[in-house]
Amino acid sequence: MQLQPSHDSQCSTHQSVIRDFNTEFNPLLEKPLSINEKLTIFAELYAVMKENMEKRDLLDRRYLRMARIWAENSYCRRRQVGAIIVKDQMIISDGFNGTPAGFENICEDETGVTKPYVLHAEANAITKVARSNNSSDGSTLYVTASPCLECSKLIIQSGIKRVVFNELYRITDGIDLLRRAGIECVHIPEL
């Protein structure tokens, strides 16, 4: 018996297999499953899940590398951060830290302190998607540094369900808030 769930039905397929295990009943055959049948189903399900996880990890790393390249567009001397919003394996928005449109592209004052009106990469990407015909609801945000508290509020309100980041910022209150809101946070330190 081969299990080949589609990506769309993966969760419901997993749930029905688990339900079958719990009831020891296969609705297709209308007889109890033997231990060997259960083990076979479990092994096939595990193989599908492992393959999906490996593909997801590969895509996560690729999108993070894209966010890192996008960060190079920032004029900030102190820290360059890039962000990409992905939905259904399509990039729907991007952003990098910098000044608002129409301002000079200088992020720091003469003493090297970041100007107060500089936007973070996440905020730039979220506001960009808000002005488009796309929706960030259910999407994934890839960002080169973990979000701050203010950006985390925007992430929650925009409907983003997953945040993948490269560098862990020393202040973790943003990540803590995202986790409290039920948003999956994935730290990939090595690309």
Language model regions located:
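Zinc-dependent deaminase catalytic domain
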Residues: 32-191
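Acidic, Ala/Val/Gly-enriched low-complexity intrinsically disordered segments
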Residues: 8, 17-20, 24, 30, ...
